[in-house]
Amino acid sequence: LHRVDRRQRQMCIRDSSRTVFPSDEFYLIAKRELPPYEFYEDFPQIENGVGMLRDLEEEFSWAVEDEPERDIKRRVTIPTGEGVYAFMEHVMDFAREKFPGLEINLVPVHNDFFGGTVNVTGLLTGRDLVNRLSRENLGDAILLAPSMLMADEDIFLDDMTVQQLSEKLGVPAYRMHKDAAGELKDILGTAE
């Protein structure tokens, strides 16, 4: 990251743009705080995981701010990769603070399928989720990040379906929306 920082300064002088951006994972591994939202300019590499977390934080906080206050009595479980667990706890706190009756049980899931060094949410499998979530009070629903599932199907990388996951754990499971406002509505139970 120090080398990239130095290179970015050079590029900014020459091109008025950082041009080179390390993925969010680099910051998580180095236990460094993610750069501020503005650092990512117009998010030219977000599909590659560059700025994705900071963008989610910003968008989710705006969605919470825009959502009208109301009494929510709901407990949801959201499994996540071990690598982003702490950051996601911080992001979920926006909703917890505004809706005190809302319980968000964020659960870090170890990736047994690909091995423990793989700690991203998008590579978790149905079996990994069953193994970890079977020890939890899951509440009203399990909410799944879209990155865990095949593009247009509710199937995990190990061919388990979301329906099979629900049946094994005895709680309905749903794919969350991709956008922050939709995710918040999924969490609140107000999604259409």
Features from the language model and the residues they span:
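A glycine-rich phosphate-binding loop feature that marks nucleotide/adenosyl-phosphate handling sites
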Residues: 17-30
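Short secondary-structure junction motifs
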Residues: 15-17, 101
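Single conserved hydrophobic/aromatic residue that forms the stacking wall/gate
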Residues: 1-13
